[in-house]
Design a protein with these regions (language model features):
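Extreme N-terminal starter segment of soluble prokaryotic enzymes
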Residues: 2-7
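Structural signal for conserved beta-strand scaffold positions within catalytic alpha/beta enzyme cores
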Residues: 8-10, 113
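Conserved beta-strand hairpin/beta-sheet module of binuclear metal-dependent hydrolase folds
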Residues: 13-75
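Active-site HxH/HxHxD metal-binding segment of metal-dependent hydrolases
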Residues: 46, 52-127
Length: 127
């Protein structure tokens, strides 16, 4: 069986209300949440799980406070020796914008998502 190493890449951060992330706790408190993509290293294909946010602004004190180096997509890939066009396969956990905004930069990649997720993405519920 093939062994992979999972390399987390912090590609963006979102500021949100804590209550959205911690059910019934912390409503009204603003928190920063890192947005991750994961590079699966070890096989013949260059595989990413999610691609993160394309554009974001994170105050420098946030990176320092949480001890995270939050990088643009291309810079994050460079930390593992890759460029967007090197990616062969993108696997999506789901199709929220903070998981798939950099897909179009991976011009040689095949993109995989669950069928139901894709159907909803193409025809969302009207609000």
């Amino acid at each position: 069986m093939r062994e992979y190493v999972i390399r987390p890449l912090v590609i963006g951060a979102n500021e949100t209300d804590q209550g959205i992330m911690t059910y019934l706790r912390g409503y009204g408190q603003r928190i920063w949440i890192p947005i991750y993509a994961f590079y699966l290293e070890g096989g013949p294909e260059k595989i990413l799980v999610d691609t993160g946010l394309e554009q974001f602004m994170v105050p420098p004190e946030v990176s320092k406070k949480y001890g995270l180096e939050i990088l643009e997509f291309e810079d994050a890939l460079a930390t593992v020796g890759l460029r967007p066009e090197d990616i062969d396969l993108i696997i999506h956990t789901h199709l929220h914008n903070d998981h798939c905004e950099n897909d179009t930069k991976c011009t040689n990649a095949t993109v995989i998502a669950q069928r139901k997720e894709y159907e909803f993405f193409k025809n969302p519920h009207p609000i």
